[in-house]
Amino acid sequence: HPPKDFKKWAQICEHIIRHYNEGWANGFHYNIEYWQIWNEHDASTPSGCWTGTPEQFYDFYETAYRHLKGLFPELKIGGPALIGRQSTAKEFIAAMAQRQVPLDFLSWHMYFHTVDAFRNNVNFFRKTLDEYGYQDTPSIIDEWNIKPFDLTQSHYMTVLTAATMCAGQHEPVDMMLYYDIRIGSTFNNVFTRRAEPMPAYWAFYSWGQMTQLGTSVQ
């Protein structure tokens, strides 16, 4: 649900940052650079992460961003972990541009079963950011995986994972974060509950071997 007081929520986040980066309240000095505001406000489901209106979310995001960026100009404050739907993504980017709210980074999610679908969304997000004046805003996929999930046990999972990472080297996306490898998670297709390798594991293993070579070929 939307916080009752957007400013107070931002102040709570301020102290979380101070706790983990500045040692406040018996904290730490982790120097975490990236801080994401919210998650999947555009999921549009009763059990989703945001039950308010899109306009309420835009107000909320602007309030949080301006408060945190004013205090921590050296950090990257961004988000909002969009679900990857092109229509709602464009609405969010357009709203931030209209309000003149900077986007230190734009994060979004994608679950798919073809590399073409991956390429299509990656290029859409980059094109839309550029169109609204955010040419310098990094595009970050902070959740990606296969869908439908019944493919996770197949050899196709290995191929798709490897092909997606290869495509990501040459498409306009700045970071890709695989979601996820928690043992027992619905989204985990890297290890079984006994920590045995699943199909996607071999794509990551092979990728790790290739990265030691230092260059990629086209």
Language model region names:
Residues 43, 146, 183:
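Active-site micro-motifs of SAM-dependent methyltransferase domains
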Residues 137-142, 177:
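Active-site neighborhood of phospho(di)ester-bond hydrolases with catalytic His/Asp-centered motifs
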Residues 81-84, 143, 179-182:
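Short, solvent-exposed turn/loop segments enriched in Gly/Ser/Thr/Pro and often Arg
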Residues 1-105, 109-128, 149-163, 190:
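Active-site cleft segment of glycoside hydrolase catalytic domains centered on the general acid/base Glu
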Residues 118, 137, 166-168:
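Long, acidic, intrinsically disordered low-complexity segments
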